[in-house]
Amino acid sequence: MDFTMSLVAGLIAIGAGIAVGFGAIGSGIGQGIAAGKAFEAMARQPEVRGTVQTFLIIALAFMETLTIYGLVIAFMLLNKMS
């Protein structure tokens, strides 16, 4: 019985790590692409810098929620270990 419980705890810990890792990878890639395209837009048309920057910050905040959701899921999984 002890082996089964430690196996379950280990798999839960791996699942928590995967949840945080994939969430961070996905939002990191998305943020990099969005920032790159925003800088390209600002370089082509400097007069729209304020508008593009505002939309970029809002979009980055939405993308960051993916990482936060992964962290919340990881905490929920780790609480199941107790």
Curated annotation (Swiss-Prot):
Q: Does the keyword 4Fe-4S apply?
A: no
**One Pfam family of this chain:** ATP-synt_C
Which UniProt key words apply to this protein?
ATP synthesis, Cell membrane, CF(0), Hydrogen ion transport, Ion transport, Lipid-binding, Membrane, Transmembrane, Transmembrane helix, Transport
**Cellular localization per UniProt:** Cell membrane
One GO MF term on file is: lipid binding
Q: Where are the transmembrane segments?
A: 5-25, 55-75
Say which domain of life the source belongs to.
Bacteria
Chief site of localization: membrane
Q: Does the keyword NADP apply?
A: no
**Membrane topology classification:** Multi-pass membrane protein
InterPro entries xrefs: ATP_synth_csu_bac/chlpt, ATP_synth_F0_csu, ATP_synth_F0_csu_DDCD_BS, ATP_synth_F0_csu_sf, ATPase_proteolipid_c-like_dom, F/V-ATP_Csub_sf
What would be one Gene Ontology cellular-component term for the protein? Answer: proton-transporting ATP synthase complex
Q: Where is this site: Reversibly protonated during proton transport?
A: E64
Kindly give the PROSITE patterns that the UniProt entry links to this protein: ATPASE_C (PS00605)
Q: What does this protein do?
A: F(1)F(0) ATP synthase produces ATP from ADP in the presence of a proton or sodium gradient. F-type ATPases consist of two structural domains, F(1) containing the extramembraneous catalytic core and F(0) containing the membrane proton channel, linked together by a central stalk and a peripheral stalk. During catalysis, ATP synthesis in the catalytic domain of F(1) is coupled via a rotary mechanism of the central stalk subunits to proton translocation. Key component of the F(0) channel; it plays a direct role in translocation across the membrane. A homomeric c-ring of between 10-14 subunits forms the central stalk rotor element with the F(1) delta and epsilon subunits.
Q: Subunit structure, per the record?
A: F-type ATPases have 2 components, F(1) - the catalytic core - and F(0) - the membrane proton channel. F(1) has five subunits: alpha(3), beta(3), gamma(1), delta(1), epsilon(1). F(0) has three main subunits: a(1), b(2) and c(10-14). The alpha and beta chains form an alternating ring which encloses part of the gamma chain. F(1) is attached to F(0) by a central stalk formed by the gamma and epsilon chains, while a peripheral stalk is formed by the delta and b chains.
Q: Give the family from UniProt.
A: Belongs to the ATPase C chain family.
Q: What is this protein called?
A: ATP synthase subunit c
Please name the taxonomic classification of the source.
Bacteria, Bacillati, Bacillota, Clostridia, Thermoanaerobacterales
